[in-house]
């Protein structure tokens, strides 16, 4: 019942065979392959001779474990006042060996993204960098990709709201020679990013601070 052979003899190694080739078939899915490992021979020392033994071989299981892969959401940007659709291809893949290449030609094509506090669609979100705003919640792949074969880790990304370009143009104003004037602080036009005069979110520029460059107003 013990593991000690007589006369100090030792079985040092055994010849093993993966019955269905799971050991070298890199596309074998994650799971336990029962009785996959078969012993086909042995080598010993200290006087061991196989002919002196009635050797019985019992099979063993081969387990394929998940492969660790990290998906990192890339930083995305939008303009203040505009909603956006998050780009589901804006992510990076880091495989177990440190590169971006998955085994067997498998590919992760897109990821499901979520803006944690809704900055992607809340047009009143102020300009700035919203750290860790973009979260990955899932993925879709091709070329045989199956999420069950991977231990997937998700890393969040930032969402940046950039300033909105708006042009304020001072209108022509007039005065009579000999009279000073007060410049009309409502005499201007607004040109928004999209070409009209309407700012987002119902915002309004009511007045502007005006200056007569050479003092002609006075």
Outline where the language-model segments fall:
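Solvent-exposed beta-strand/loop surfaces, strongest in extracytoplasmic domains of secreted
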Residues: 1-218
């Amino acid at each position: 019942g013990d593991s000690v052979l007589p006369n100090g003899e030792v079985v040092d190694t055994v010849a093993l065979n993966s019955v269905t080739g799971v050991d070298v078939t890199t596309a074998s899915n994650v799971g336990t392959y029962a009785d996959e490992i078969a012993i086909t021979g042995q080598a010993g020392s200290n006087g061991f001779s196989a002919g002196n033994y009635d050797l019985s071989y019992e099979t063993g299981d081969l387990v394929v474990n998940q492969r660790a892969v990290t998906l990192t959401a890339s930083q995305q940007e939008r303009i203040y006042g505009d909603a956006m659709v998050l780009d589901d291809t804006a992510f990076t893949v880091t495989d177990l060996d440190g590169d971006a290449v998955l085994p067997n030609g498998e590919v992760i094509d897109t990821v499901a993204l979520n803006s944690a506090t809704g900055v992607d669609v809340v047009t009143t979100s102020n300009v700035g960098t919203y750290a860790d705003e973009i979260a990955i919640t899932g993925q879709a792949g091709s070329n045989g990709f199956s999420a069950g074969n991977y231990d997937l880790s998700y890393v969040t990304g930032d969402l940046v709201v950039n300033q909105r370009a708006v042009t304020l143009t001072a209108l022509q104003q007039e005065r009579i020679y000999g009279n000073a004037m007060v410049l009309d602080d409502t005499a201007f036009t607004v040109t928004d990013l999209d070409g009209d005069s309407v700012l987002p979110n119902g915002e309004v520029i009511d007045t502007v601070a005006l200056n007569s460059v050479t003092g002609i107003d006075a």
